[in-house]
Every structure is written in structure tokens, then in C-alpha cells.
């Protein structure tokens, strides 16, 4: 006699389990700015001396940039949240596709490579799929500085052909205040011959942080954070030690977490004027926000009402907080409208929020939101970094349990997120186990069929 038993196992990728509806309390610690850290790490290529960068968050994007620098010949030593970079022996001018395709900030290396080695080759970079983010402005800026640049088969090839292998100062006007283009031109022009001006540059705090470190290395950068940046080229740059500014996007996410869970919280360290637009909108929708000590903010949410926002470059409302703010508006009293003006594909969270009971209608890049009393836990998935953060906030406030997949996105930009939220009172945990009953994961589950166990009996 024999019998055959078939076991079917549904295997879910690493995910977060969130038991929603719990208030938060205490302090949420803000890490160093990811976007600033990436540019600062690339800037280490500009000097032959050692550079120490402190308050660097431990993220997958930072790991990718670290591997890129090692591939170019730099030596890195990491201790907790500090990175020492020695670029004295860089020799490789070509960045590998397998690293570049996942990190848009990899393009920051082009300017330093041109100034140090006179040449750079890089595949067109990747990053979050949130719409077209061409590097045209970066390339035009490098060309204005005297570099010869061509794009062949999606590979950017740049070189300096002057006798002394130095770029030449120029007057550059950006069509759009691109952060990446501003940082690329800023780094490339520090060692250029002569004076460079950037009109209509990005004014983000990360630009100011980069300029501050470059100046401590011996560069001559003036006007960062204003509508015109002036750079006087120098012969060489020295090493330095620099502490990264707090991450304003993480801080904003935490402020919104307090609001959506209707929980008083202390957030910090922060630089308040980096968050002016966000603080203004949170106050408008019903939150009390005040300075708490020298480097923290205290937020006390009251009844949350719908308010309209439109994203724009700094000092406007940041596009990186559009998705988290939409989660808040989904549970606000009344209606609201959110218009995305920076990226055209940054509404991937709408479908997931509606799955949780939100009432959001999307028309092109404008979301029309009718607030509901509460969201309901569900199986949800993040499609990019900031939409993932928005969905996690929704899960925290929702009634019932949620399962979130998309950790690869969260780990790019939020350091130890579940640990921080758990310390503040949330019930959120990272899981790697198998799940057998969540059918709505159909597009993510790997089914193992035909696992047969045969038992033979005489």
C-alpha cells in the first residue's frame, strides 16, 4: 500500500509585518542625509589626501557607492557611521554597469574623474523608477567646462583634451535647478582653471553641505543655497573631516508619522529651516510644532484637516515627501489635492493606499483625495523608496495587520527604520518566514508544487 501527499508552500520575499493602530511616543532619531552623503563620497575623489565623513547612514545606496569608489581604486575604512576614504591611488576611469544601473548618484563620480584622471566612462545611471531623469544638464555643464562628452550605446564617455588636462571655468545657466547637475558641475569646477558661475542652480541643503565640505578641502565656492553659485578654481584640494547634515526627508517622514498616528513625538536632530515648507503644511492641517532644545522638534497632532500641496524644488515642498504626505491626507478630515511637478511617475503609492481603503482619484500628476475615517490593514507593496515610506506610514495608522513587501526600496534610504519605529512604540517586524494563506500576494509568491512525500507499507 502506498500514499502520496502533496505539499504546497507559498514563499514570500523578506517583508515587514505591521500591526497598525498603535500610538507612538518618545523620540525618533534622524540619521545623516543619504543624498548628501552620496555626493560627499564622490567628492572624496577630488583629493589625494584622506577624507573622513561622519554621520553617514548605513544604507544599501551607501554600500553601492562604496563599491564604486573601491572599483575606481579608492580605499575605504568604515567604523559605525564614519567612512574614511583614501583616493590617492585611483586609476580606473570606467564605472561598471552592474553597480551604476541601480544608483543614479554614481554619475557624481564623472566630474572628479575628469579633474583627476582626465577621462571618465559611465553607463547611464539608474535609481528609483519615478520618471525621466535625464543627465542632459550634467553633460551640458561638463561640455561648457571644456570636456568632450559623447553618449554611445547608453555609455557616457568624457575626456579633457587641454594640454594641462584641466577643465576651464565657464558661465553656466541651468534650464532647471537640478540637484544632480548642480553637484556635478560644482565638483568638476573646483579644480578647473579660472572662474565658474552657475545660474539657476539647485538650492537644496545638500548643495550647501557639499559646498561646505569642498571649502574645508580648500575649494573656493561662494553662494551655495542662493540663485547663483561662484567657484574660483584652485590647483588642488586637501583632505578634511566633515559631519553630514541630518536627513531632512527622514525627519519629514517622521513628522508625518506622528501626524498620521495622531501621536506627540520628538524628532531630531533636525535643521528646522530645511523643513520650512513641510512644517508649514503640517501646521496648516492641524499640528502644533515647536522647537525642543537646540536640535529637535516637538510635534503634537490635533484634528487633521485636508490641505493642498504642490511639489517644487527647494525651498518648496519636497517631492520626496509627496507620497508620505498623501498617506496623511488619506485619513484627514475633508478633501485635498496633491500636485506632483518634479517627477511624472511618482504616484505609484496611490493604488496601494486605495487597497487599504483610501479614496484617491488620480488624474495625470494630480491626486484628488477624500479623507476617510480609517485605513484598513492589507497586503501591500512598495514600488520605489518614497512610495514605500508612504505605505509604511499608512500601515502604522491602519486598523488591523498589514504585510509590506519592497524592503529593497526602504533599505536604500531609511536606516534601521523598523528598529526606530519599534523603539517609539509601533509593532513592526522584519520577517523571512514562509506564508501560506495570503492569496493577494499572487504576483510575488513563489509556489513550490510537487513536493511529494511517499510512504510505502507492506
Swiss-Prot record:
It is found in: Cytoplasm. Its EC number is 2.5.1.7. Keywords: Cell cycle, Cell division, Cell shape, Cell wall biogenesis/degradation, Cytoplasm, Peptidoglycan synthesis, Pyruvate, Transferase. It is an enzyme of class 2 (transferase). Its main location: cytoplasm. The active site is at residue 128. GO terms for molecular function: UDP-N-acetylglucosamine 1-carboxyvinyltransferase activity. HAMAP family: MurA. PANTHER family: UDP-N-ACETYLGLUCOSAMINE 1-CARBOXYVINYLTRANSFERASE. Cell wall formation. Adds enolpyruvyl to UDP-N-acetylglucosamine. This is UDP-N-acetylglucosamine 1-carboxyvinyltransferase. It comes from Prochlorococcus marinus (strain NATL2A). The gene is murA.
